Amino acid sequence: APFEPRAAAIKAGKLVLQQIHEYARRGMDFAFETTLSGKSYANLLSELKSKGYALHLFFLWIPSPELAIARIKDRVAEGGHHVPAEDVRRRFVRGLRNFFRYESIFDSWMLFGNSKAAPVLIAKRFNGNQEVLDHQEFFKIVGKWATLK
């Protein structure tokens, strides 16, 4: 509902989870977008893994919630949906924390820097082999994560 954006966001999140469970029940392949900030992802990912799903993560990193807030402001000016600044800040912290918390669950992951016009691959892990392509940026991210623990 346009006058109750938080209620609409909660309802939308529940619908996404229902759809994921339905796809998994049918054994269908699927992808979904998330901030990775929710509390239920560890259980969901473990459940999908136990059903034989291969899990692949593309994580888009930005250095600050302020950049996300500025991008949201631009999106709203173009007719997109608004996200309150306090939600952005909370999700920023949780999303980064959960990337490092859950990264071992994924069969593969790619970590992109997303502060420029196009995403830039910083690090990746495939078949258990991790490779850091941009050490300076990767250690900046690890340092940010360490302050959030």
Question: Language-model segments: which ranges?
Answer:
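Short glycine-/polar-rich loops that comprise or flank the Walker A/P-loop
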Residues: 27, 51-56, 105-108
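Helical mechanochemical/support elements of P-loop NTPase systems and associated helical scaffolds
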Residues: 8, 12-16, 37-40, 68, ...
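Conserved substrate/cofactor phosphate-moiety recognition/catalytic segment
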Residues: 1-28
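Acidic, metal-coordinating catalytic cores used for nucleic-acid/nucleotide bond scission
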Residues: 32-42, 62
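A generic structural signal for well-ordered alpha-helical segments
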Residues: 23, 48, 102-103
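NTP-dependent small-molecule kinase module
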Residues: 102-149
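A glycine- and Lys/Arg-enriched "phosphate-lid" helix/loop adjacent to the NTP-binding pocket
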Residues: 53-98
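A short acidic, amphipathic alpha-helical/loop segment
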Residues: 43-47
